[in-house]
Amino acid sequence: MTKDDESLDLVKQAIREAGLRATPARIATLQLLRESPSPLTHAAVAEHLSGLGVDKATAFRNLNDMTDAGLLRRTEVGDHVWRFET
């Protein structure tokens, strides 16, 4: 098993342990935010995932679901834009 396979398995496991289905969009979202050196906005996440066929509404819903499940943190620094991080 390669390091990438192990990382993917850990992401899937974390999503499932949080009580969510490990869909391709959620897996890609969590991987993106784990690899990001800084918090990302919904727009940035949606832009990164658009190449995978994930629309903005799905990206936003997944960010909220994963925040509610404790996988992500949501912050707002006074500019009325939420940023997400692991």
PLM features: residue spans?
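Pre-recognition alpha-helix immediately N-terminal to the DNA-recognition helix
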Residues: 27-32
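Short acidic, hydrophobic short linear motifs in intrinsically disordered regions
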Residues: 39-48
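Short, Lys/Arg-enriched N-terminal segment that forms or immediately precedes the first helix
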Residues: 5-19
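Short helix-capping/hinge SLiMs at alpha-helix to coil transitions
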Residues: 20, 34-37
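Basic amphipathic alpha-helical segments that dock to polyanions
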Residues: 33, 59-69
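Non-DNA-binding regulatory cores of transcription-related proteins
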Residues: 68-86
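Short, leucine-enriched amphipathic alpha-helices that occur as contiguous helical runs
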Residues: 8, 25-26
